[in-house]
Amino acid sequence: MREAVSITGQGIICAIGNDLPSVLDSLVHARSGIRPMKYLNSRHSELPVGEVQLSNSQMKRILGLEESTLASRTSLMGAIAIKEALAQVGKSRLEGKRVVLISGTTVGGMDLSENYWERMKNEDSLLNLPLCNDCGNSTVEMARMAGLEGVRCCTISTACSSALNSVMLGAEMLRHDEADIVIAGGSEALSRFHLNGFNSLMILDKEPCRPFDETRAGLNLGEGAAFVVLEKDAGSRTLSYVTGYGNRCDAFHQTATSENGDGAFLAMKDALEMAGIAPGDIDYVNAHATGTPNNDLTESRALMRVFGDNLPEISGTKGLTGHTTSASGSI
């Protein structure tokens, strides 16, 4: 087993809560955040989504920002989750340390880009396209709004694996002495671009999604952010350890997993081997469980390949939060 990495802080915001205690309470009581659109303006208003129940203006006030501050919803949610995670650690611990922020996002500031495109058409000018729409700059803006001036920033865009890839990269940086503290996770906001893309794949359910159910008909898109603070073995301050992980790409199809879940199977196998444990040591699996016919079937097959007849408890949370895509791994 390789050197363990400690998780010492956690922060989250999503459709079922604006912080860790409220999210946990919603999970325990199975309160769903899937509801009609409130903040997203879309022609597909019949589709339920998992929206964070705060406007951009409310999030700016939480962060102590002026209303005029130009910030994407992705950056605002990310900054709120980061600040919660840092509050648990104590910001003074960052002083004099090599701190890195790694965020996973694929949509970035698309919520702003969509609105500015309309202005560009009307005003015949490119000057209205703000830099903060870029995925990479979303991470820089999160750092600034969370009071992390001067930290190194990195952005990962690997769709639904983005946030967990951020955690994996952070753990590797610590193990190779490239950083002292890493804040890793992901943030993703709903946007028309986002919704339309998934709708074109015909995998969005008009009812609350039902992962692993025989009658499942698709997913509900969601939004949110979650970040963890990673440190080299932190002793008694450790909330949990990152002991093993795996990353595979079977290159089967751009939007579908292979029939027998080869990528998921190999990634889980790698994670177990890195951690130095056997499948029988696992008590619970939080599955990707999107609610689509393809994902849930192939993921189930991958799990059965790993665990055989001794399946542990398995469940997913997207039926409550919606599929938060790039942020889903850390959420």
Task: Go through each PLM region and give its residues.
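Condensing-enzyme catalytic core mediating Claisen C-C bond formation in acyl metabolism
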Residues: 3-8, 26-39, 44-47, 204, ...
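Conserved active-site "lid/cap" helical segment
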Residues: 16, 21-103, 109-110, 267-279
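A glycine- and small-aliphatic-rich helix-loop capping segment at beta-alpha/alpha-beta transitions
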Residues: 21-25, 114-125, 142, 173-176, ...
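Active-site nucleophile and cofactor-binding loops and adjacent substrate-binding regions
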Residues: 41-42, 70-75, 129-136, 153-162, ...
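Glycine/charged-rich beta-loop-alpha catalytic/anionic-binding loops adjacent to active sites
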Residues: 60-67, 119-128, 145-156, 205-214, ...
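Claisen-condensing/thiolase-fold acyl-transfer catalytic domains that form or cleave C-C bonds
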Residues: 79, 158-175, 219-222, 226-237, ...
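Beta-strand segments within the central parallel beta-sheet cores of soluble alpha/beta enzyme folds
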Residues: 97-103, 153-157, 182-187, 239-245, ...
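Active-site-proximal gating segment of KS-fold condensing enzymes and close homologs
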Residues: 102-154, 295-309
